[in-house]
UniProtKB/Swiss-Prot annotation:
Ca(2+) binds at Y27, G29, G31, D48. Heterodimer of A (AC P04084) and B chains; non-covalently linked. The A chain (acidic) is non-toxic, and increases the toxicity of the B chain (basic). The A chain may act as factor stabilizing the complex structure and hence retaining its toxicity by preventing non-specific binding. Upon binding to the target membranes the A chain is postulated to dissociate. The keyword Calcium applies. Negative results: the B chain (not complexed with the A chain) does not induce neurotoxic symptoms, hemorrhage, organ injuries and other macroscopic changes. Belongs to the phospholipase A2 family. Group II subfamily. D49 sub-subfamily. The active site is at H47, D89. This is Basic phospholipase A2 vipoxin B chain. Gene3D superfamilies: Phospholipase A2 domain (1.20.90.10). SMART domains: PA2c.
Amino acid sequence: NLFQFAKMINGKLGAFSVWNYISYGCYCGWGGQGTPKDATDRCCFVHDCCYGRVRGCNPKLAIYSYSFKKGNIVCGKNNGCLRDICECDRVAANCFHQNKNTYNKNYKFLSSSRCRQTSEQC
């Protein structure tokens, strides 16, 4: 669920880091359209696409098991859609960490008018 996703992000990037990714670029936060602005925004685009492929439960609400082992996110013994959601969140949190140097403060709270290009397909 989104709370667990936030904990994954904070675990990879430090306490309260999740706030950097709420309303960032064209895809981080609720909804999304246009072309991702940078590698960080692309992490959110890929995460949105991943959630869109999940069947059988609500990715934003379903609770799955996971843990941190030596700084790595490890999805637990989830089945079906819970496993899929955990993997979506794990990959995105790792993506934010791998691309933290692309983070651009100018894309925080970006106006939706800057995201009007034709949206990419997943």
